[in-house]
Amino acid sequence: MFLLTPVLVAVVCILVIWVFKNADRSLEEKKEEARAQPWVDEDLKDNTEHLQVEEDTEEWQESEESVEHILFSHTRYPEQEMRMRSQEFYELLSKRRSIRFISSEPVPMEVIDNVIKAAGTAPSGAHTEPWTFVVVKDPDMKHKIREIIEEEEEINYMKRMGKRWVTDLKKLRTNWIKEYLDTAPVLILIFKQVHGFAVNGKKKVHYYNEISVSIACGILLAALQNAGLVTVTTTPLNCGPRLRVLLGRPSHEKLLVLLPVGYPSRGATVPDLKRKTLDQIMVTV
């Protein structure tokens, strides 16, 4: 019968202790990694990377494939004018800031129509245009939206977001109180459509729907700045389903961004932040 010598026993004990210590360290690292992960709004998860199985949509496919191609009309500017226009556009957008103090002064509805039409020119996967812009002007509806968002945002700040995220936001002096949702004359809620419907009523895949809608949001921000209006990009975490029901939107639409829109209130302030320089954001190969 094999007998363990004292030396062998010591070696076995050391190995056992080493295994347990490494297991504990690995567990702690996983816990720390989980704590460091930013909280994700489950309602916004985009499953298009899994290539949704599309139902039989032959009628839709045939009609799309037969779209006529026309000659592209392009205006080419002299180089000097190109430089001037690009510089002027940059200077315009460089003044864009996130404004949390918004006046209740009404804005022309025609301007809102135009900026949303501009956002609707965004490119999209397979030209599916997977966006819905909900414009809210009614004071009672705006207040209901505020109540839902503030209720969830308080939980986000206290529990879901984590200490690091909350600390990073302190320089912006922001919290779960969103007075601008009442004072702004217009709220624009941008929904992504996770799928659409073909002419035969079957589901139609909306490829890269979140990326497409995000591009549209960027164009909308630029259009608002060009029109002389201000906003703050609001992402109402965990509020999507309730706001979708409140606004009567279908289940295949998911809330991506909310923009309160108007003029800045008198005495509005912004944090004195600096943007990264060109050499910090661009790499030329």
Curated annotation (Swiss-Prot):
Pfam families tied to this protein: Nitroreductase (PF00881)
EC number annotated for this UniProt entry: 1.21.1.1
Main location: membrane
GO molecular function, a single term: oxidoreductase activity
Cofactor(s) of this protein: FMN
Binding site for 3,5-diiodo-L-tyrosine: A126, E153, Y157, K178
CDD domains noted in UniProt: iodotyrosine_dehalogenase
Membrane-protein topology: Single-pass membrane protein
Record carries keyword Cell membrane: yes
Flavoprotein in keyword set: yes
Catalytic activity: 2 iodide + L-tyrosine + 2 NADP(+) = 3,5-diiodo-L-tyrosine + 2 NADPH + H(+); iodide + L-tyrosine + NADP(+) = 3-iodo-L-tyrosine + NADPH; 3-iodo-L-tyrosine + iodide + NADP(+) = 3,5-diiodo-L-tyrosine + NADPH + H(+); L-tyrosine + chloride + NADP(+) = 3-chloro-L-tyrosine + NADPH
Subcellular location: Cell membrane; Cytoplasmic vesicle membrane
GO biological process, one term: thyroid hormone metabolic process
Annotated residues for binding of 3-iodo-L-tyrosine: A126, E153, Y157, K178
Membrane-crossing residue ranges in chain numbering: 1-21
Superkingdom, natural source: Eukaryota
Chain positions recorded as FMN binding sites: R96, R97, S98, I99, R100, S124, G125, T233, T234, T235, R275
Function of the molecule: Catalyzes the dehalogenation of halotyrosines such as 3-bromo-L-tyrosine, 3-chloro-L-tyrosine, 3-iodo-L-tyrosine and 3,5-diiodo-L-tyrosine. During thyroid hormone biosynthesis, facilitates iodide salvage by catalysing the oxidative NADPH-dependent deiodination of the halogenated by-products of thyroid hormone production, monoiodotyrosine (L-MIT) and diiodotyrosine (L-DIT). The scavanged iodide can then reenter the hormone-producing pathways. Acts more efficiently on 3-iodo-L-tyrosine than 3,5-diiodo-L-tyrosine.
Protein name: Iodotyrosine deiodinase 1
Species whose genome carries this gene: Rattus norvegicus
Lineage of origin: Eukaryota, Metazoa, Chordata, Craniata, Vertebrata
